[in-house]
Structures are given as C-alpha cells and as structure tokens.
Swiss-Prot record:
Its EC number is 5.3.1.24. It comes from the Bacteria. PANTHER family: N-(5'-PHOSPHORIBOSYL)ANTHRANILATE ISOMERASE. Pathway: Amino-acid biosynthesis; L-tryptophan biosynthesis; L-tryptophan from chorismate: step 3/5. This is N-(5'-phosphoribosyl)anthranilate isomerase. Pfam families: PRAI (PF00697). It is an enzyme of class 5 (isomerase). It catalyses: N-(5-phospho-beta-D-ribosyl)anthranilate = 1-(2-carboxyphenylamino)-1-deoxy-D-ribulose 5-phosphate. The keyword Amino-acid biosynthesis applies. Belongs to the TrpF family. Keywords: Amino-acid biosynthesis, Aromatic amino acid biosynthesis, Isomerase, Tryptophan biosynthesis. Gene3D superfamilies: Aldolase class I.
Length: 223
C-alpha cells in the first residue's frame, strides 16, 4: 500500500479534515513557509490526535538544539530534514529521520549512501533558492529505481490528484507527500484530498507494491 502524508497542517480544522479522509500521517512545517506553524500550535493539535497517527516535523537547517527542543515539546514521531543538513547532523537523534533530497539531475542522488542514520529519503524538486514546498514537479525518470540502500522512497514535489497516479506507476514509491496539491485558495480542501487518495488507490491496482522497511511504517509529505 502506498502511504500518504499530507503536509502543512496549520490548525485543528485541517488536521481533522485529513484524519476524516483516512490519512494518518500529518506534516507540520517548522521552517519559513506560508504553511509554517508555531510549536505551541502544533503541540495543541498533536495532543488531540487519536492513536496510530504519525506526526512529522519539517525542518530546514534548524540548529540541532532547537530541533531537539521542538521535537520533544511537540512529541513528534518523525523528523524531516529538508535543508542542507550534512550526514553528521543526524548522529544521535532519537526520532526516526527522513532526509529530503532536491533532485536537479542524476548527480543529485549521489549523496544518498552517506546518510546511513536516516530511515527514508524524500525526493523533491530542485528550485533555485527554495528548500521545498514549491509545488513544482521534476523528472521522475531520474529517480526511477534510485539506489537508496533499501530505504523507503517518499515522492514529493508538485503532486496533485491529476498526476500522482502516473508518478506512482513510474517510481513505485513507498509513500507520497502532498501539500499544495490538495489545497484550494491556500487551504486544505476535502474534495481535493479525496480525489488525491482515489488516484493513489487506482494507481496501486496497476502494480505490486515492493516490501518496505518497517522503520517508516505509518508514513502516509511538499510543504
């Protein structure tokens, strides 16, 4: 089953909408973004979430002490590192880690093997001067069969109900990550979310899912 993460949750109304749609992995952005959220607001939402919900914090070049403080305060399950964090940044962090890689060309994937302490890779579009959340797609052929050392691939970057099916059939990711693609006028939209999930379901019917590492189980992230 292809997992789905909906990122950029800003309030309880959006969180409840996502949960009601059947998605159990929510992303909270603690970096400069139109969808950024304060730790206090994120914690308030997270304390209301039902069991078996996975929370992912998105960070961009956050100082380690600050990242650990926010992760502990908000009780985050997974940390998504979406900046230029080097492999050694990951050492000693207790939460499960996802390292985002911005894909410009085939050479963009050369650094994957250095990140031995992460549990998965999120592949996003490379846009000059932007860490992520651009709503821009990239050439999925570049990451088809990417050598990740057996670690799960989470596909992001401009995914929408209209294109996610094709992306899944080509890349066969462990999970897909969406934010702006399920929004209308900058807010999460139930009809767009439902259409996205239906497109994922239909795409799954056309291929057999590979077995994924249990380290990221629960991930159901563009911010």
């Amino acid at each position: 089953m292809v997992r789905v993460k909906i990122c950029g949750i800003r309030d309880w109304e959006e969180a409840r909408m996502v949960l009601d749609a059947g998605v159990d992995t929510l992303g909270f952005v603690f970096a400069r973004s139109p969808r950024a959220i304060k730790p206090e607001a994120a914690r308030e939402i997270i304390t209301k979430l039902p069991p078996f919900t996975t929370t992912v914090g998105v960070f961009v070049n956050e100082p380690r002490y600050s990242l650990m403080e926010i992760a502990s305060f908000c009780r985050l399950d997974v940390l998504q590192l979406h900046g230029d964090e080097p492999p050694e940044y990951c050492h000693g962090l207790s939460q499960r880690l996802i390292k985002a890689i911005r894909v410009r060309d085939a050479a963009s994937l050369a650094s994957l093997e250095a990140y031995r302490e992460v549990q998965g890779f999120l592949l996003d579009a490379w846009v000059p001067g932007k860490a992520g959340g651009t709503g821009t797609t990239f050439n999925w052929e570049l990451v088809r069969g990417a050598a990740t050392g057996g670690k799960p691939v989470i596909l992001a970057g401009g995914l929408t109900p209209e294109n996610v099916g094709a992306a899944i059939q080509l890349v066969h990711p462990y999970a897909v990550d969406v934010s702006s693609g399920v929004e209308v006028d900058g807010r999460k939209n139930p009809a767009r979310i439902a259409a996205f999930l239906e497109a994922v379901r239909k795409a799954e019917e056309h291929h057999v899912r590979p077995t994924a590492s249990s380290c990221c189980t629960g991930l159901k992230g563009d911010f």
